[in-house]
Swiss-Prot record:
Name by which UniProt lists this protein: Polyunsaturated fatty acid 5-lipoxygenase
Cofactor comment: Binds 1 Fe cation per subunit.
Residue sites binding Fe cation per the record: 368, 373, 551, 555, 674
GO molecular function, one term: arachidonate 5-lipoxygenase activity
Taxonomic lineage from the root: Eukaryota, Metazoa, Chordata, Craniata, Vertebrata
Record's GO cellular component terms: cytoplasm; cytosol; nuclear envelope lumen; nuclear matrix; nuclear membrane; nucleoplasm; nucleus; perinuclear region of cytoplasm
Length: 674
């Protein structure tokens, strides 16, 4: 009788093993086997991290093996089991790999196909077509769209983490508990003694050092020492944790009535302000999005305030960006003066602090939450709903949506919900952050997620004119490496554009993103369909780059740039000044966050800036969903390209007082998971 050797690999994460009964059935072209119990006498099967082998003898020849069915039945108490893969050695000596990388829960079962990636058109056998269809039908029942707030991109239909499908939950929910992590962070930073001191002001700037962790030769220490300087202020628009707002100014906006006379002390080329604009030396950052947003009113004992500043910047003769004019609200007038570097020291400093605070709000809610977290969740849900596990694009993308839906669900449960942690320390808490997302969705376009196009649209693409924009330089290198990789994968499975156009599962995936993620907005520019290999490669690059590089660039620098509270105040306790010459140091300190809010803020930026244990960085694919040699070779080339970029960035950063490393591939996690 024919005999098969079955190798079963159990996951190595916590609680991956099982004591339940595991049964296996083989389904082939010539028939199906009986159900076989996988069990070895006096042996503890399916332990965490184990690879177990079993001999399975069948009554008759099964022909070509199409499917492997695994069933789990209760032994004593139910325990979930994480199955990595099954390898089958046939009676003819052939080896067939069946990737799984999924949890089997309860009295569950799972049916696996071999690891060869297949488009729907490649499946001509009825049982394989049926398996493909049933998998998507089941997934679409599990992964349902839900509107969390009106106008938001749709998210997963789950009220809390435990409501999620087991396959996309965190291995241990405890590790991503925001309340626990923030509390731990404050304990690790030795600031928990201050965390309940709301309404208690700091005495002066030096007093903030009581909660500042001094680590020499770090960016955070340099920020603390130089945050008041115009050069440091300007540098952050290029290479801080929100390097996506600065634009080249092509015409001075009427709402900012600044004149040459006002700023002539800052201009170094003997040109008028209008001439400097024409020469491309003037830049602008406009926080119009914050105009009219409701400030946090959740604490009746503390009034909190927002501004909507406009900041004009200048490229000096050293090619450095420095501020030359700041207006703290959108409507010009006597009570909304334009602050200048020539004003009194504290007038100018407070104006810059207001800009930094506004930048923090836009960064957290729009640059970070909306444009990486929520967008990546949309891609993830659409992928699970429309691409079966055998589809090459599922195999390509699954590593880049790992834990994204889970972290967003935890955020909605604990962080950005009503009375959540976000409300504790942020002036946009209490609903302002929701209003901001609802506004910003209108500007969420496909082209703004295409990195080279986004840089060009802001007039920031010239390396000659703007030489110290490392976010742009490194981002382009990583974008090109990802695009080269996706084009290789696309070319392996789609021999021409027609195959792309006729792949209905791909088209359904793209349509799901457009209809539910972008809410069917034509102005978003998101494609409803994809008709060429080139456009498909670009689309996949957007998905991967957003989840990996873009998130890394705007997330992991938060402690570096925001831990010194005066450089990134999460709230302000007095309104913006309406006149010049009245600001004092005492007024500035009383405007900055109190001790309690400072500590909650510090705990947040520390926790959000930490890599996960066993982090998977860009190019690392330990789950072998692909088994074909051409794709594995493409992955090797991808990793080599990324290693070369790591070397380029390391060489540039040598001896730099302010190194830029957020887009070094060895520091870019594969997915949004924190």
């Amino acid at each position: 009788m024919p005999s098969y050797t079955v190798t079963v690999a159990t996951g190595s994460q916590w609680f991956a093993g099982t004591d339940d009964y595991i049964y296996l059935s083989l389904i082939g072209s010539a028939g199906c086997s009986e159900k076989h119990l996988l069990d070895k006498a006096f042996y503890n099967d399916f332990e965490r991290g184990a690879v177990d082998s079993y001999d399975v003898t069948v009554d008759e020849e099964l022909g070509e093996i199409y499917l492997v069915k695994i069933e789990k039945r209760k032994y004593w108490l139910h325990d979930d089991w994480y199955l990595k893969y099954i390898t089958l050695k046939t009676p003819h000596g052939d080896y067939i790999e069946f990737p799984c990388y999924r949890w089997i829960t309860g009295e569950g079962e799972i049916v696996l196909r071999d690891g060869r990636a297949k488009l729907a058109r490649d499946d001509q056998i009825h049982i394989l077509k049926q398996h493909r269809r049933k998998e998507l039908e089941a997934r679409q029942k599990q992964y349902r769209w839900m509107e969390w707030n009106p106008g938001f991109p749709l998210s997963i239909d789950a009220k809390c983490h435990k409501d999620l499908p087991r396959d996309i939950q965190f291995d241990s929910e405890k590790g991503v508990d925001f309340v626990l992590n923030y509390s731990k962070a404050m304990e690790n930073l030795f600031i928990n003694r201050f965390m309940h001191m709301f309404q208690s002001s700091w005495h002066d700037f030096a007093d903030f050092e009581k909660i500042f962790v001094k680590i020499s030769n770090t960016i955070s220490e340099r920020v603390k020492n130089h945050w008041q300087e115009d050069l440091m202020f300007g540098y952050q628009f290029l290479n801080g944790c929100n390097p996506v707002l600065i634009k080249r100014c092509t015409a001075l906006p009427p709402k900012l009535p600044v004149t040459t006379e006002m700023v002539e002390c800052s201009l170094e080329r003997q040109l008028s302000l209008e001439q400097e604009v024409q020469e491309g030396n003037i830049f602008i950052v406009d926080y119009e999005l914050l105009d009219g947003i409701d400030a946090n009113k959740t604490d009746p004992c503390t009034h909190q305030f927002l501004a909507a500043p406009i900041c004009l910047l200048y490229k000096n003769l050293a090619n450095k960006i420095v501020p030359i004019a700041i207006q703290l609200n959108q409507t010009p007038g006597e009570s909304n003066p334009i602050f200048l570097p020539t004003d009194s020291k504290y007038d100018w400093l407070l104006a810059k602090i207001w800009v930094r605070s506004s930048d923090f709000h836009v960064h957290q809610t729009i640059t970070h939450l909306l444009r990486t977290h929520l967008v990546s969740e949309v891609f993830g849900i659409a992928m699970y709903r429309q691409l079966p596990a055998v589809h090459p694009l599922f195999k390509l993308l699954v590593a880049h949506v790992r834990f994204t839906i889970a972290i967003n669900t935890k955020a909605r449960e604990q962080l950005i919900c009503e009375y959540g942690l976000f409300d504790k320390a942020n002036a946009t808490g209490g609903g302002g952050h929701v209003q901001m997302v609802q506004r910003a969705v209108q500007d969420l376009t496909y082209s703004s997620l295409c990195f080279p196009e986004a840089i060009k649209a802001r007039g920031m693409d010239s390396t000659e004119d703007i030489p110290f924009y490392f976010y742009r330089d490194d981002g382009l290198l990583v974008w090109e490496a990802i695009q080269s990789f996706t084009m290789e994968v696309v070319s392996i499975y789609y021999e021409n554009d027609q195959v792309v156009e006729e792949d209905q599962e791909l088209q359904d995936f793209v349509k799901d993103v457009y209809v539910y993620g972008m809410r069917g907005k034509k102005a978003s520019g998101f494609p409803k369909s994809i008709k060429s290999r080139e456009k498909l490669s670009e689309y996949l690059t957007v998905v991967i780059f957003t989840a990996s590089a873009q998130h890394a660039a705007v997330n992991f620098g938060q402690y570096d740039w925001c831990s010194w509270i005066p450089n990134a105040p999460p709230t302000m306790r007095a309104p913006p000044p309406t006149a010049k010459g009245v600001v004092t140091i005492e007024q500035i300190v009383d405007t900055l966050p109190d001790r309690g809010r400072s500590c909650w803020h510090l705990g947040a930026v520390w926790a959000l800036s930490q890599f996960q244990e066993n982090e998977l960085f860009l190019g690392m694919y330990p789950e072998e969903h692909f088994i074909e040699k051409p794709v594995k070779e493409a992955m090797i080339r991808f990793r080599k390209n990324l290693e070369a970029i790591v070397s380029v960035i390391a060489e540039r950063n040598k001896n730099k007082k302010l190194p830029y490393y957020y887009l070094s591939p060895d520091r870019i996690p594969n997915s949004v998971a924190i």
